[in-house]
């Protein structure tokens, strides 16, 4: 299955050999763990002298704790989790963290309950009216207080005129438990990664109101995260780990057939433990929202895109810090660029990509327009954090992520 460019395997010889051959690699039961699972199980790591021991976790808080303690060497992780732990707002003491590469873009969703559907709350405008006119306060679930799902949920609600910290309640629910919580009536909606949004639609437990790629086309999502200590102690192991997962990412996107075989692999009990028909369609970009609408999404879940997905852009890391500031999680502006340069392992990533003949991309920043029309390009992050009409900059106490 694996073919290596000339010179790629030179990394496993001599002084460039990995200092650690067995890597404990954490992941959550989400479709976007695909490149990690494929790398570990389909022969992409062994040529580099690595054995990847996959360790499925039941919650992001548990994954965080094992990553910080060293029980996990690296993990499929939320972008916002890595930065929150680094900044000391992630529910643990501050710990120097590292982003080795991006694992995916797009592919998360906001779903609402069948009860709201029965009340004809099936559009952003209807949700805005309901929130501001109903006496009953809605409860939305996300997966970790500083995670990507919390940030997409907050950003999307705010773009519709709904203050995510004042107008609705927010709770943390692990991804695989989302559908059960919705079915039990404990929550009115959620933001989560696949396959759990599609699963809710398949089980007739509500509908998909918005996708994360509608909020920010080709947004950053999961990363390969670890502690800075791991990179410093095992730099060669970190580099070839990136190479193995880069090759797996490229393989998944090589053809629709490879995406289908990946969906089949992920459906197994050891990984997502979910029906194939909840995984495969949206992995192939085929969406059905549960309201009768179907479309082929041009910004569906992607893992590689010639390396554009995988570069740990400085601006991506900085964006999450601007949102922590916006929502009162940070009480003062961090050194946005300085922190991002410390966390994002750009040099190591580019060495790995270049060795595989993958475009290492010369730009450390990228520019995007989000759903509210605002452009984010990494410039003036402090001003950007202050530029939003809805925020919690001055009147919310500092919050910390809890279990």
Regions found by a protein language model. Give the residues of each.
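Short, glycine-/small- and polar/acidic-enriched structural segments
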Residues: 2-165, 171, 188-198, 205-218
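Short glycine- and hydrophobic/aromatic-rich loop-to-beta-strand nucleating segment
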Residues: 110-111, 223-226, 230-231
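Inter-helical turn/loop segments and adjacent helix faces that build the functional surface
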Residues: 163-168, 232-237
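Functional cores that coordinate and move charged inorganic groups
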Residues: 175-176
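Short gly/pro-enriched beta-turn/loop segments at secondary-structure junctions
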Residues: 218-219, 261
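Secondary-structure end/capping motifs
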Residues: 235-343
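Conserved C-terminal helix/tail region of periplasmic/extracytoplasmic solute-binding proteins
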Residues: 318-403
